[in-house]
């Protein structure tokens, strides 16, 4: 019976054959990921680094950027949503069916760390995001006054997170540092 199905699929559509084998052998799971954070935290740079492994000059995101990226055995459908105040009010429109949140923090922006904390906890407490993993990137570690991971955990009260998987990684999206480790963790927790 298996041979018959296999031959029928191959003759009918090669794409269907590959989809069948991806399904049969556990490859190709798609995860819907939101990349959120305050404006100028490095969300778009991080997404571009994942997409092409190259840094590039970005401009403030008006609305959102979407990329589909293969990462190991997963396919990430990633939405990088603008972090300006007017766009943060719209984030909730993207929460349905979300599999994980990537929250990017500008580690050098001490003045807005309390705003980042409020936004992070608003997400952590949102009922539509209950039980999904959160990956925090302490970004811009290349800057001389960037706070380290331990300081950001303290400033954002992340040790109070309960009943969900979470991790924080120091990163520099412009250089690509720390991103792979974070997404390896995320892949294992989806």
Q: Which ranges hold each PLM region?
A:
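TRAFAC-class small GTPase G-domain
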Residues: 2-3, 7-190
């Amino acid at each position: 019976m298996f041979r018959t199905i296999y031959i029928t699929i191959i003759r009918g559509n090669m794409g269907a054959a590959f989809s069948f084998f991806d399904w049969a052998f556990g490859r190709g799971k798609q995860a819907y990921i939101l990349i959120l954070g305050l404006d100028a935290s490095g969300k778009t740079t991080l997404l571009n680094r994942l997409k092409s492994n190259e840094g590039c000059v970005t401009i403030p995101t008006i609305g959102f950027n979407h990329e589909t990226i293969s990462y190991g055995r997963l396919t990430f459908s990633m939405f990088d949503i603008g972090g300006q105040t007017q766009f943060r009010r719209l984030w909730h429109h993207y929460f349905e069916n979300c599999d994980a949140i990537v929250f990017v923090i500008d580690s050098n922006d001490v003045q807005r760390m309390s705003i980042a904390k409020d936004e992070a906890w608003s997400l952590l407490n949102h009922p539509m995001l209950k039980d999904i993993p959160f990956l925090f990137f302490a970004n811009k570690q290349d800057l001389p006054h960037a706070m380290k991971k331990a300081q950001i955990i303290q400033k954002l009260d992340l040790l109070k997170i309960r009943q969900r998987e979470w991790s924080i990684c120091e990163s520099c999206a412009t250089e690509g540092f720390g991103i792979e480790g974070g997404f390896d963790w995320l892949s294992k927790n989806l």
